[in-house]
A protein has these predicted regions:
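Short, conserved beta-turn/loop elements at beta-strand boundaries and strand-helix junctions
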Residues: 68-73, 121-123
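A broadly conserved sequence feature marking short terminus-proximal activation segments
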Residues: 1-27, 134
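Short coil-to-beta-strand transition motifs
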Residues: 55-64, 110-114
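Residues immediately within or flanking Cys/His clusters that coordinate Zn2+
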Residues: 26-29, 43
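Short, basic/aromatic beta-hairpin or loop at an interaction surface
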Residues: 82-98
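Short, cysteine/histidine-rich loop/knuckle motifs that typically chelate Zn2+
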Residues: 31-34, 45-51
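Well-ordered alpha/beta subsegment
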Residues: 95, 99-136
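Short functional micro-motifs and their immediate structural scaffolds
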Residues: 40, 53-55
């Protein structure tokens, strides 16, 4: 049993390839075989052209912070030891936006437009959670 006490992501048939790739420390998103659009969160059809043809394609993991919040209060007991912690929305170079924790950056230094890159947190043997840190 893992010592990780925070909620784990719910793995579904639609998002299973995302979590399998994350476990290998790869960031993969769905890409439409019809129009070429990347999208996230995962789903059964392209949100632009409604094509059911999609592939799970590796993406760069690089992007910029488009929005953020810093939590100074633990709304759930499992997060009390992390206060303060940042949650960012990152616009990836490929277009989609992902919401994740920002790590290794003091809250006062977080800025909209800050370049970031993905890192993976191996929270259990089965689950690696994508997070972001300041890009080198």
């Amino acid at each position: 049993m893992s010592g990780y006490a925070r909620p784990l992501p719910r793995v579904t048939p639609d998002n299973l390839p995302f979590w399998e790739a994350a476990r290998r420390h790869e960031l993969r998103l769905q890409r439409c075989g019809g129009c070429g659009r990347f999208w996230h969160p995962p789903g059964p059809v392209c949100p632009d052209c409604l094509s059911e043809r999609c592939d799970w394609t590796p993406v760069s993991g690089r992007g910029t912070v488009s929005s953020f919040v810093v939590f100074h209060k633990a709304y759930f007991p499992a997060f009390a030891d992390a206060i303060p912690y940042a949650v960012v929305q990152v616009e990836l170079e490929e277009g989609p936006r992902l919401t994740a924790n920002l790590v290794e950056v003091p809250p006062a230094e977080i800025r909209i437009g800050m370049p970031v890159s993905v890192v993976f947190d191996d929270v259990t043997p089965e689950i690696s959670i994508p997070r972001f840190r300041r890009a080198p």
